[in-house]
Amino acid sequence: MENITEKLENFNKHKKLSVKVNLKQRYKHNKKKAEVCGECGSFLSFDLWRNKETNDEKRTLESANFCKVKWCPMCAWRKTRKLAGEIKSTLEQIEAQYKVRYLFLTLTIKNPPLTELRNTIKYMSNAFKLLTKNKLFKKNVLGYIRAIEYLGDETKSGEAHPHYHIILAVNATSYFGGNYISQAKWTELWKQALKADYTPIVDIRTIRAKNEKWKDSDSAIFETLKYCVAPLELVKLSQENFKELDKQTKGARQYNKGGLIKTIKPLPNATLDPELWEYMKTEYFNFVNGEYKKCATKKEADQKNHIKQKQKVSDSQN
């Protein structure tokens, strides 16, 4: 039987992070956005289903009020879950057709002033395009998913630390045969692509799946896609630096795909078979005093939370 406490655990964790980041205060200059951020995740409703054959229970998220702001830990987590599921589906399809291994590549650039972040992002993007056109890259890499992160753990005030986290799908036979690219070579290739007069920090490592159950691969997918700025780094930012970061990254793409990871589409998410699963009821929860608490009815939930807008949630994001 499904445990609702366990299901709510991750929502609780990320809602608490959202409270700590306090986007409502960060966007105090934008009243409407501040209100949406402040209410994000304060309401959840789940549909409860029962398996007619086994009596097992399952809950699916039916509606909620999410802000969808990129700095929000709750919304970033949900976006990561959705995209990670899609990427995993694509990688499994690639594995069925090719003998592949996966690499986790991190590419950096010298820290720019925060006021130059937008220009630096564009410069890195162009450099990465050059890297993908290199014959060694084209010969070995079947596909990639690339994500950008804007700050590091110890980025100085007034600076940015844009860097890429990338999962590479490589031809296992050729890459680990005669076409292996060492970390020193990856560093050289990235330095050339950047046209840099310094040696950038580059890290490359093999992702090893334990017992073919994707444990490490799943971890790498989440590491790559998790967020563009760690929540605790956002907390450290001054209001002035946050506004500049928000301005510099407006409209910037967080994720990019290439090769087979772009061309092979994820399979549709499985849905509950209505012949097998019976709808039982809808359960309502409000975030009160640091945790989600159940409400007896939808009316009670609305009265307590003063919800102005609720969003239907697709099965892929449950």
List PLM regions with ranges:
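Right-hand nucleic-acid polymerase module
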Residues: 1-160, 170-318
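Cys/His-coordinated zinc-finger cores
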Residues: 166
